[in-house]
Amino acid sequence: MAETTASGYIQHHLQNLTFGQLPNGGWGFAHTAAEAKEMGFWAFHVDTLGWSVALGLIFVLLFRMAAKKATSGQPGALQNFVEVLVEFVDGSVKDSFHGRSPVIAPLALTIFVWVFLMNAVDLVPVDWVPQLAILISGDHHIPFRAVSTTDPNATLGMAFSVFALIIFYSIKVKGLGGFIGELTLHPFGSKNIFVQALLIPVNFLLEFVTLIAKPISLALRLFGNMYAGELVFILIAVMFGSGLLWLSGLGVVLQWAWAVFHILIITLQAFIFMMLTIVYLSMAHEENH
């Protein structure tokens, strides 16, 4: 495979199916990264939205099916799996969340399963989903990205949703005055009112950076790990297309080895996203941090 062809292959697999306003004023899909960039802020990543919604529906339907078939007698395989998963998440919440809220455990379960399913799509061979999109659309230049968590828009969207909950519960539990005081009166304090007033800008700067770093680090950690994993799969696929027998053979070994290792990564990243969400919301429920 020539270098330019390999470069084009990689760029094509890392480009989202973007829908937005074209330079001619009409609306349609971008075929190149340059066209997608020209669409601006109001462009939609159709593949990211489609996969995330579809996998969310699969999660809801599977758990609804398990709930409807739940029995106190001999449970089926699906019921056993769901019960183990629910107990695992519930135990994680009890260990890490020190407030009282009926929302946190269901939220943690939703985050873990949903993020895991989106990550797990990365185990599908990199060419299958894009080729299926080409067959359906009939357009050989159309890009299609299957792993939603390799799109920073998806991870940032989830992270800032968690951030909104952090702000909501901080104000609900501590009151607006308590929340503002948390941002302005900590970590430095003084009994002297004048000195305390001088420390308010310093405290606010430190606390604001700490606060805004939570969703950004939450999003970029998931995105970075999944993007790197997807890129490795794509580079291995380039080996298969090299035309060299020894590279193709090496690609088979690497594909299998990386897929096995990647199972740990996709599970761990879903777990970390869930646990950090629980910890951040626990901090929001504390009177003093």
UniProtKB/Swiss-Prot annotation:
Superkingdom to which the source organism belongs: Bacteria
Q: Which UniProt keywords apply?
A: ATP synthesis, Cell inner membrane, Cell membrane, CF(0), Hydrogen ion transport, Ion transport, Membrane, Transmembrane, Transmembrane helix, Transport
One GO cellular component term of this record is: proton-transporting ATP synthase complex
Naturally occurring in which organism (per UniProt):
Pseudomonas fluorescens (strain Pf0-1)
Quaternary structure (record) = F-type ATPases have 2 components, CF(1) - the catalytic core - and CF(0) - the membrane proton channel. CF(1) has five subunits: alpha(3), beta(3), gamma(1), delta(1), epsilon(1). CF(0) has three main subunits: a(1), b(2) and c(9-12). The alpha and beta chains form an alternating ring which encloses part of the gamma chain. CF(1) is attached to CF(0) by a central stalk formed by the gamma and epsilon chains, while a peripheral stalk is formed by the delta and b chains.
State the compartments where it is located.
Answer: Cell inner membrane
Q: What is its main location?
A: membrane
The record gives the membrane topology as: Multi-pass membrane protein
- Classification via InterPro entries: ATP_syn_F0_a_bact/chloroplast (IPR045082), ATP_synth_F0_asu (IPR000568), ATP_synth_F0_asu_AS (IPR023011), F0_ATP_A_sf (IPR035908)
Q: Which GO terms describe its biological process?
A: proton motive force-driven plasma membrane ATP synthesis
Q: Which PANTHER family does the record associate with it?
A: ATP SYNTHASE SUBUNIT A, CHLOROPLASTIC (PTHR42823:SF3)
Q: Which residues cross the membrane?
A: 43-63, 103-123, 160-180, 193-213, 232-252, 259-279
Listed CDD domains: ATP-synt_Fo_a_6
Q: Which family does it belong to?
A: Belongs to the ATPase A chain family.
This protein is called ATP synthase subunit a
Xref: PROSITE patterns: ATPASE_A (PS00449)
What one GO molecular function would you report for this record? proton-transporting ATP synthase activity, rotational mechanism
Give a short account of what the protein does: Key component of the proton channel; it plays a direct role in the translocation of protons across the membrane.
